[in-house]
Amino acid sequence: MLMALPVCGPAQSTERRIERTVERIAESAARMAERVSERVSRAFDEWDRADDERLQNQDFVSRIDTTIAFSANGTVDLSTISGEIRVTGWSRNEARIQAYSERGDLRFSASSSRIRIEARSRRGRMGETRYELSVPQGSRLIVQSTSGDVTARDVNGPVDLHTTSGDIALHGATGSIEISTTSGDIEASRLRGDIEVDAVSGEFDVTDAEGTIRVETVSSDIVLRNLRVREATASTVSGEILYEGAVIRDGHYDFRSHSGNVTVRIPANSSARFQFETYSGELDSDFPITLMPGERSRSRPRRFEFNIGSGEARIVTETFSGDIMLERSGTSR
């Protein structure tokens, strides 16, 4: 069912609404870019301040290849300027660390509960750097990288992955999950916990997640598939949003895009109160609906609400120049 809704409200009010929306988007994009950059660079700033005092007597090395006894509750902390990073979780109570740098700039320390690897450019050297780690499942993983791809599989513990320029792939994590990148794609699956993602550019795709999820991007499409979360928040300035998953009783789902379409694909037996707002878009619904006018004023002239089932969950969608699609799962379109 396709519904094109008439624009209402004075022209002056509409123009001011557009101006406020553009201002809000510009401010949001600037804040997001600054937040991601600060998060990635903070570790390096702290490292530089303490570098001479803490590591002045430690030699640089070009290669690490060792296996140590390591607790499943331990922390793996890796900070690097560049290089490909691969981390895999396994069932052993030990960690295998393999790292190589043509620049000879690796620093390594380890105990039974914490592993720390640091790498940085020195004396203008260039060259390849790579890391491969196998750690006990359940370990906490922290990665700070300026340039390079990060892949983590089956870690099944808390994860903090932050890059300035590089793709991130995360498959299997539990607990607190934080991901950020300034420029790079993010692909994730099998996540259980509280998930937070900040990105400026690049694509975001997550499959199979439980718990809560919050995603904020500037110029990215957001794809969320096979989710069973009680709370989902996704916002993007110039991308599209797809949410495909369950709607949990008393759950809250909020999806907002300025210039992209928003698609919500949920089971036919879902129970939710659906609220949508759009300026120049249309609503396309697989569900039979009866529109109930919501809050209507000069600043919000096109906001409507309706119930699916008994309306137990809350779904909010908002676009400025995009369409909103409400689809039944499994429906061929």
Q: What kind of feature is each model-predicted range?
A:
Residues M1-R333:
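Intrinsically disordered, low-complexity terminal regions
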